[in-house]
Amino acid sequence: MWRLPGARAALRVIRTAVEKLSRAEAGSQTAAGAMERAVVRCVPSEPKLSLSFALADGSHKNMQRDQSEPLGRVLSRIATNALKGHAKAAAAKKSRKSRPNASGGAACSGPGPEPAVFCEPVVKLYYREEAVAEDVLNVDAWQDGAVLQIGDVKYKVERNPPAFTELQLPRYIMAGFPVCPKLSLEFGDPASSLFRWYKEAKPGAAEPEVGVPSSLSPSSPSSSWTETDVEERVYTPSNADIGLRLKLHCTPGDGQRFGHSRELESVCVVEAGPGTCTFDHRHLYTKKVTEDALIRTVSYNILADTYAQTEFSRTVLYPYCAPYALELDYRQNLIQKELTGYNADVICLQEVDRAVFSDSLVPALEAFGLEGVFRIKQHEGLATFYRKSKFSLLSQHDISFYEALESDPLHKELLEKLVLYPSAQEKVLQRSSVLQVSVLQSTKDSSKRICVANTHLYWHPKGGYIRLIQMAVALAHIRHVSCDLYPGIPVIFCGDFNSTPSTGMYHFVINGSIPEDHEDWASNGEEERCNMSLTHFFKLKSACGEPAYTNYVGGFHGCLDYIFIDLNALEVEQVIPLPSHEEVTTHQALPSVSHPSDHIALVCDLKWK
C-alpha cells in the first residue's frame, strides 16, 4: 500500500543486500581493506557532535565533542582510547608476541624478556584521499564519506545517517487488526525504510529457515522465529498467529542511504479479535482511496480515555460494556482499524487524548498516508488528519472560544451583547471548548484550497445558549479565515456539536440566523437568559443529513454530530451508510466489544463544484 507493486522485488533485493552488509559489518574484518563504520551526528542547532565507532578489541566508543573544537584534539583522544582498549585486551591475554595491534596500537618491543610496551596508534582523518588538517574545526572536518584511520584500521565516516530515535510496538495486539509500530526517524523517511516481520514459532515447529540474519536469532533457548511474507510497515495478524509474539526487523533509510538496523519484540502475544465489528460492513464502501475530484471526510468522537476510565463511566454511563472493552489498549485496536479502513482524505476527531494522538493515531494513520495536527483543550482535544498525497497543510488558525470572545476585535459586537447578561457571560467564559481550523491546499492543483474546521461544543444538556454563542464565535472566525485570509475557499465544518436537529444551534447553522426569542436562550432557566439575535453569511448543509442518532448510550440516543459543508462550493457524492440498528444494539448500546466509542463516525464523499 505504501510502495508501488513493481518496486517490491527491487526492495527485496536491496533489503537482502543491506542485511548482508549489516552481518558483515557486525563481525570482525575478514578481508584486507574492509572498513568499519564511524557514525557522526552533527546538527547545526546543537553545540556538540557525537562520534561512535567500535574498536577491534570489542569496545565501543561514544564521544561527545564541541563542534567548534579543532580536529587534532579529537584525534589525540581517539589515540588514547585505542591504547587503553588494547592494554585491557592485552591484560586478558597473558602471552602475546610482538606484532601489529589489531585494535590500532603497535607493539613496541622492549629489551630482554620484558613484556612489550604498546604505543599510541597514529590516528588520522582523510577526506578525498587527503589528510584533514588538525586545525580544522570538527563541524567541517567530519564529512560524510571521510575515512578515519586508527593504526592499521580504517573506518568509513557516515555523517547523519538515517536512524530510529523511537521504535515501539503496541502493548495489545489482536488478530485481524493492524499492528502499527510507533517510530520516529532522524535524517530518514519511513517510506524509504525497510521492514520485515517475524512471528514466534509454535512449539515443535521446524527451525527457522536458513538465511535468517544472525541478529534475529532466538532471544532465549525456548524461542525461535519464523519469517512472514510481510515486508511493509504494518502487519495484520491472522487467527493462526493467536498466542504468538511478533518481531519487527527494520532498517532506516532516506532514499539513498540505510542506517543501522534495529529489531524489537512484542511484549504480548496476539489475542483473538472480537469477531464482526460495527464498521466492517461500512468498509465495503471505502475499499479504495477516492479520486482527486473527491474528498472523503470523516468526523468522529472517539471517546477520550480520560472519560472512559472513570468509575462513573463504568457504573453509570456504560454499565453494559465489558470492562476490558473500555480499556484504552483494547479500544485503540478498533479505532485504528476503523479509521484506516475508511481510506479517508480528511479526518476530524474529537475527544482525543494527547498520548493517544502521538502514540496511537499518528503511527497508525501515518502508515496509511495521512498526517495530523492536534489542538489540546483541557484533558483532551481535537485532531485533524489529511491525506498527504492529496493535500498539504498551508496554515492553522486554532482558537479557544472564550479567549477569542474576550480579546479578538472580530467578536466585539457579540461580546457587547453578552455583557448585558452577567450570569450567562460568566458561564460562557468558563468553558474551555476550542476550534481547530486548518487550511489545506491540493497537491495536484495549487489553486484548490479548503478550510477544514473541527470542534466539540459544550456538552451539558442545558447549555443550549452556550453552544449558540460558541457557534457564533466559530462561524465568525471561519469567515475571517475563508473570506479575509483566503478569499473564496470552501468550508468543511466537522464536529460533535452536542445538538440535535431540533435545537437552536442547528437552526442557526442551517438557516443563517437565530431570533432573540428562541427558547434556547433560556436553556438553563430565566436567571441565565440572554436574548440576542445572531446571523451568519454561510450557506451550510449537513452532508450526512439528520440520522436518527450518532450517539447511542444506555440512557440517550440522538444525532449530535455533523459534517457541515459550503453549498456554494461543495456537493455530496455519497454518504457511507451508518451501522444498522441491530449492529448498534447487539451488545445493548455503545461502546461495546465491537465498537470503540459511544459515538458513530460520519463518513461521506464530497465533490468540488
From Swiss-Prot:
Tell me the Gene Ontology biological-process terms attached to this UniProt entry: antiviral innate immune response; cellular response to dsRNA; cellular response to interferon-alpha; cellular response to type II interferon; defense response to virus; mitochondrial mRNA catabolic process; mRNA processing; nuclear-transcribed mRNA catabolic process, deadenylation-dependent decay
| UniProt keyword annotations, A-Z | Exonuclease, Hydrolase, Magnesium, Metal-binding, Mitochondrion, mRNA processing, Nuclease, Phosphoprotein, Transit peptide
Residue positions of the active site: 496 (proton donor/acceptor)
Coiled-coil spans are: none
Its recorded reaction(s) are: Exonucleolytic cleavage of poly(A) to 5'-AMP
Say yes or no: keyword tRNA processing present: no
Q: Where is the composition biased (Basic residues)?
A: 89-99
Ranges for the region named Disordered are 89-111, 206-230
pH-activity profile: Optimum pH is 8.0 for 2'-5' oligoadenylate exonuclease activity.
- Extract one GO cellular component term from the record: cytosol
Main localization of the protein described in the UniProt heading:
mitochondrion
In which tissues has expression of this protein been reported?
Ubiquitous.
Query: Ranges of Low complexity compositional bias?
Result: 100-111, 213-224
Location comes to: Mitochondrion matrix
| First and last residue of the signal peptide | none
Binding annotation for Mg(2+) 1: 351
According to the UniProt record, list the residues that bear Phosphoserine.
217
Give the EC number: 3.1.4.-, 3.1.13.4
Which positions bind Mg(2+) 2?
496, 498
Q: Which InterPro entries match?
A: CCR4/nocturin_mRNA_transcr, Endo/exonu/phosph_ase_sf, Endo/exonuclease/phosphatase, PDE12-like_N
Which family is this protein grouped under? Belongs to the CCR4/nocturin family.
Name of the protein described by the UniProt record: 2',5'-phosphodiesterase 12
Q: Which organism is it from?
A: Homo sapiens
